[in-house]
């Protein structure tokens, strides 16, 4: 189960339908709740006063009626996304799988670092011993 939310080039958002997701159900309810939104606007005269005082908001609602129904009916259920979110269970870098991959890579890097450190230590030790042996041979 998963869905993608993204902005298009005009700044409008859209997503693919997923009937099992609660956010998608809330959004579907918002699109089908236009009578509820009309009743809400009739019962709240301050909203009408706000629309009269803010003509740009009224123009926006006239240009995007789905947004008007969405904003009044489910204002607290789902907020407009501003970036693209890809939320899907099919991705390997998701949830527990991502954590396990990160731990595996971390352990691999620690192992390689220890092997490299041991190799450098042994090489330096060998070079120092060879140098000291050559000094001892020269001093005799």
From Swiss-Prot:
Keywords: Glycoprotein, Host membrane, Membrane, Transmembrane, Transmembrane helix, Virion. The keyword Transmembrane applies. Glycans are attached at residue 86. One of its GO terms (cellular component) is virion component. It is a single-pass membrane protein. The chain crosses the membrane at residues 92-112. Its main location: host cell. It is found in: Host membrane; Virion. Belongs to the asfivirus B117L family. This is Uncharacterized protein B117L. It comes from African swine fever virus (isolate Pig/Kenya/KEN-50/1950) (ASFV).
């Amino acid at each position: 189960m998963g869905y993608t939310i993204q902005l298009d080039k005009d700044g409008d958002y859209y997503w693919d339908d997923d009937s099992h997701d609660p956010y998608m159900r809330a959004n579907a309810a918002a699109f089908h709740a236009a009578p509820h939104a009309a009743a809400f606007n009739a019962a709240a005269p301050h909203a009408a006063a706000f629309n009269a005082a803010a003509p740009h908001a009224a123009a926006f609602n006239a240009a995007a009626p789905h947004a008007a129904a969405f904003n009044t009916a489910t204002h607290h259920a789902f907020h407009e996304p501003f970036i693209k979110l890809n939320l899907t269970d099919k991705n390997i870098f998701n949830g527990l799988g991502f954590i396990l991959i990160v731990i595996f890579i971390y352990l691999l890097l620690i192992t390689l670092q220890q092997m490299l450190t041991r190799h450098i230590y042994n090489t330096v030790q060998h070079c120092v011993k060879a140098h000291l042996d050559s000094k001892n041979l020269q001093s005799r």
